Amino acid sequence: MSRQSTDTAVSSQRLLASAIGVAITAIAAPQAAQADEAGQKKTDKDRVLSLDAATIVGEQQDETTYNVDRSASKKYTAPLLDTPKTVTVIPQQVIKDTGALTLADALRTTPGITFGAGEGGNPAGDRPFIRGFNAESDTFLDGMRDVASQTREVFNVEQIEVSKGPGSAYTGAGSTGGSLNLISKTAKQDNFTDAGFTWGSDQTRRTTLDVNRMIGDNAAFRLNLMKHDAHVAGRDEVSVSRWGVAPTVTFGFDTPTRATLSYYHLSTDDMPDYGLPLTNVNRSKANPSKPASVDRDNFYGLKDRDYRKSTTDSGTFRIEHDLNDNLTLSNSTRLVRTTLDYIVSNPDDSRGNVANGYVYRSAKSRNSTSKGWVNQTDLKANFETGFIKHTLVTGLEFSYEDVHNRPYAITSGGGAGNTCNARLLASGDCTSLNRPTPGDNWTGSITDGLAYTDTDTKTSAAYVFDTLKLSEQWELNLGLRYDDFDTKSSGYQTAGRNGPAGYFKRENNSHFWNYQTGLVYKPAPNGSIYLAWSTSSNPTGETGGEGQADISVGNNGLDPERNRNLELGTKWAFFDDALSLNAALFRTDKTNARVASPDVSTLQVLDGEQRVQGVELGFNGKLTEKWKVFGGYTYLDSEIRKSTVKSDEGNKMPQTAQNNFTLWTTYDLLQNFTIGGGTTYVDKQYGNTANSTYIPSYWRYDAMASYKVSKNVDLQLNVQNLTDKRYFDQVYSTHMAHVAPGRTALLGVNFHF
């Protein structure tokens, strides 16, 4: 059984903390003497940001901006103002100002994203739903699919791009509601050191170090380090611990050939939390189940049994060469290995004990290793055909992923059964609903399980994108992609929904085309109106690498689900491009959704239809030189239009908030003093297609104040969930709802040299 050594973990954490301290001391001493010069240099250059992460060296961009005007992905062949698609870029400054410490924290600054709960696979924070559709397998890193199940941090993230609507022409399999593109920090043409120390409520301690050094005139090295430990506000016994390191080196600044080599490591060691049980086991649409009315801090896990540990190691090499002024060839290769190991208590698991004042601790586990690689080649060209100007990108993409999972065999110490009684209470398998005891002496056993699954997924793809400038007012944006998606699943299964116990082997091979087209009209240089059409495909086994179920006997022979999107929108830039506003009307249809067969319960058929239509508004940038805003609003009208379960027809889609509003704003009261605040509204969400489980709507408020002590030192105070609101941010289809953290105060001290 691969439970990691606690002593080893502690030693690694102490080693990292010591390394950060030594590095800060060593670097700060000589830098202090050059503080004035470095501070002036930083002001003059505005700290160059490598925006085009798929391109080794990008355009310079103000790092303090709330408004980014161009995507980092090569596949977007026009500025965002002229891109016929809703794309929200969460810049570094928004991540800093909001005090975001996780990917989920950062994503809450943009509307139209909710988070799903699940029994296994990825940590729930890495399971976003975009415009009502699951996007957990639609996360990209620097324009390449981030293969393998993993936990993601923000210490090495420069910005986050959220693309809305079906986009398989850009991404391949998935991206029905949209996709995420995380842009990592790379070496810059500058010398600087940033060190941050954060102390907070609930024993929060976070240390970060970001060092960039030029190596001669045309190369640079950058190192990011992070150590984070905290308990979770409002939740007994729940804690998180993680550390990470990310070195990167770039060669060839200001030359025709440029290359970057990067490495990333993240280790986590958490006490997992599945939240509170749902109440009504005899639930229905007319009588839906909601979270139990108990104290928010009630924790139903076992602190001496439950754990979750993960590691991520990835290495990336990117190179590009300018063949001439209008033609650039680039290639990127990434190798990834991740591990995910946990045992967690699912509160009650729909066993009906809640009505009697008890909770059954249903143990869930995973012990997986994922390995994979991605290779992507792009050719970017600028040329003219007659009066038409083209910006074209064409490329090839190949990827491979192997996931091995052998869950643990967990045996109750109280014998068979899951209805709470004196025997199961004594063994620690059950606890009180109102006064749970996470310190119970659990008397069961944990061994390596007999069942295991190996899932291999291979993808080969070719694509082309072109922005055709027909005139000063008209542009045509086109994209086309072909995918060969092959996934195989084999292993040993115990008796259950996939048949009798024994060895199995299943395979699904899918070939699909996807496209997008958009017509852009520019009534003025600072504005655009567009009409766009796009498609996406969801093949069987798409989420296998992200911790979800392997290919089953019920779906291994099915064709991909197909999705299409029609969007009418407009984008405008004001105040010399300091402020961006956008609005869009859209309709996304899934025309052949996988649903249960009406004839054989273990099989699925492509006989469902789903629709999400609505409106999205967005704003980001400066209203004045002192006042910044970032946020938006979405209205999502979701509907299950057709299903083999007739009672589901007309219902709302799960994990879809009809109304979602986000606002973050800051104001410079003085030259060195800034205040800020934010609010988020998320509407009611259902946990399943039957609409028989739900979590209620909520408002959340946040606040911030920062003070520049000098050009080298600043302070920042964040208070998240200012009113200590008790709310739920994830709901599962049958069992539980995740409790969001309570009020959290964070005080950061940051040094810049």
From Swiss-Prot:
Q: What's a single GO BP term from this record?
A: iron ion transport
Naming one, the record's GO cellular component terms include: pore complex
Q: How does it sit in the membrane?
A: Multi-pass membrane protein
Listed A to Z, the keywords are:
Cell outer membrane, Disulfide bond, Ion transport, Iron, Iron transport, Membrane, Porin, Receptor, Signal, TonB box, Transmembrane, Transmembrane beta strand, Transport
Q: Which cysteines are joined by disulfide bonds?
A: C420-C430
Consequence of gene disruption: Deletion decreases sensitivity to siderophore-beta-lactam drug conjugates; phenotype is complemented by ectopic expression of PiuA or PirA, or by heterologous expression of probable siderophore receptor PirA from A.baumannii. In a pvdF and pchA double mutant background, in iron restricted culture, growth inhibited by 60% in the presence of dopamine and delayed in the presence of other catecholamines such as epinephrine; growth is inhibited further, but not completely abolished, when pirA is also deleted.
Any idea where the TBDR plug domain is? Answer: 79-185
User: Which CDD domains did the record assign?
Assistant: ligand_gated_channel (cd01347)
Signal peptide location = 1-35
InterPro entries referenced in this protein's UniProt entry, alphabetically: Plug_dom, Plug_dom_sf, TonB-dep_rcpt-like, TonB-dep_rcpt_b-brl, TonB_rcpt_b-brl_sf, TonB_sidphr_rcpt
Looking at the Swiss-Prot or TrEMBL record, what is one Pfam family this protein matches?
TonB_dep_Rec_b-barrel
- Record localization: Cell outer membrane
- Name the predominant localization: membrane
Q: Which Gene3D superfamilies does the entry link to?
A: TonB-dependent receptor, beta-barrel domain, TonB-dependent receptor, plug domain
Q: Where is the TBDR beta-barrel domain?
A: 190-753
Alphabetically, the GO molecular function entries are: porin activity; siderophore uptake transmembrane transporter activity; signaling receptor activity
Role noted for this protein: Involved in the initial step of iron uptake by binding iron chelating siderophores, thereby allowing extraction of iron from the environment. Probably involved in the transport of siderophores, including host catecholamines such as dopamine.
Task: Report the family membership.
Answer: Belongs to the TonB-dependent receptor family.
| Protein known as | Probable TonB-dependent siderophore receptor PiuA
* The organism of origin for this protein: Pseudomonas aeruginosa (strain ATCC 15692 / DSM 22644 / CIP 104116 / JCM 14847 / LMG 12228 / 1C / PRS 101 / PAO1)
Q: What is the lineage of its organism?
A: Bacteria, Pseudomonadati, Pseudomonadota, Gammaproteobacteria, Pseudomonadales
